[in-house]
């Protein structure tokens, strides 16, 4: 996970650099004005450990980009899971004189007001982690998106689970030749959750693992919610669950915390 955060942060910082070059080339700003680069980072929440870690890594990457000619100031705000509030925070960042905006949308389908505000002030916007729909990204040439390779993450998850299952036949506790599984999904409609789920399951099937889906629960990428959802699943299916998959580490930790309270034989997959 640390490598994943670092990779996204590096891509973000590189994209910021590219956006600044475009901005400098088109704006006619003086060298004196450009000595300080103000970057505004607005996340969807302040309660997501992955996003918080990613923000910290981005700050470190940008700090490393500073030199005698340029100082970089990073300001951060949270939308607190409310798109209207996030829009207001973006407006505050624009009024404060930010040169570049990095935005982790609350609602990936509702970036229009943010795009309009930024475009009016000619401020590049880099969306990250939650990708706007293509039609929105095509509204303006100074809109960018940086995110993880969710397909690859799903494939890797499926490969790890398949390797364990194929070498541990005892996972199939009821000996029916199928693996009964439940799934903790990150968020309804989130492109990463959709891809990770799809490709983890496809990869297991390609590895000759026959699956039977018992249920899934949305846990919003959150450890506490995952623990609560696992409580429901265990209450309903008990030891009939042979495999648990989750879309991110936080939900996996919540799942483990719940399972630790009531030990279940068999393997749970990450």
Kindly give the residue locations of the regions a language model identified.
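Sec-dependent N-terminal signal peptides of Gram-positive bacterial secreted proteins and lipoproteins
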Residues: 6-27
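A residue-level marker of the well-folded mature domains of exported/periplasmic proteins
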Residues: 2-5, 26-270
């Amino acid at each position: 996970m640390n490598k994943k955060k670092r990779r996204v942060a590096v891509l973000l910082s590189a994209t910021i650099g590219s956006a600044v070059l475009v901005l400098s080339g088109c704006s006619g700003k003086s060298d004196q004005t450009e000595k300080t680069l103000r970057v505004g980072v607005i996340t969807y929440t302040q309660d997501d450990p992955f996003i918080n870690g990613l923000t910290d890594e981005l700050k470190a990457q940008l700090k490393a980009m500073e030199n005698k000619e340029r100082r970089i100031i990073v300001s951060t705000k949270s939308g607190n899971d409310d798109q209207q509030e996030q829009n207001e925070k973006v407006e505050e960042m624009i009024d404060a004189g930010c040169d570049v905006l990095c935005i982790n949308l609350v609602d990936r389908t509702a970036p229009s007001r943010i795009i309009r505000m930024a475009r009016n002030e000619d401020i590049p916007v880099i969306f990250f982690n939650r990708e706007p729909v293509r039609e929105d990204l095509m509204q303006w040439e100074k809109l960018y998106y940086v995110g993880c390779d969710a397909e690859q993450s799903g494939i890797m998850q499926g490969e790890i689970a398949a390797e364990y299952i194929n070498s541990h036949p005892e996972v199939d506790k009821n000996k029916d030749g199928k693996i009964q599984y439940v799934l903790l999904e990150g968020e309804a409609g989130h492109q990463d959750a959709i891809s990770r789920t799809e490709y983890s399951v496809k990869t297991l099937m390609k590895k000759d693992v026959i699956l039977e889906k018992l249920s899934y629960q949305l846990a919003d990428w959150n450890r506490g919610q995952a623990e609560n959802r696992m409580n429901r699943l265990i209450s309903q299916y008990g030891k009939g669950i042979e495999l648990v998959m989750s879309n991110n580490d936080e939900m996996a930790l919540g799942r483990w915390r719940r399972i630790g309270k009531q030990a279940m034989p068999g393997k749970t997959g990450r």
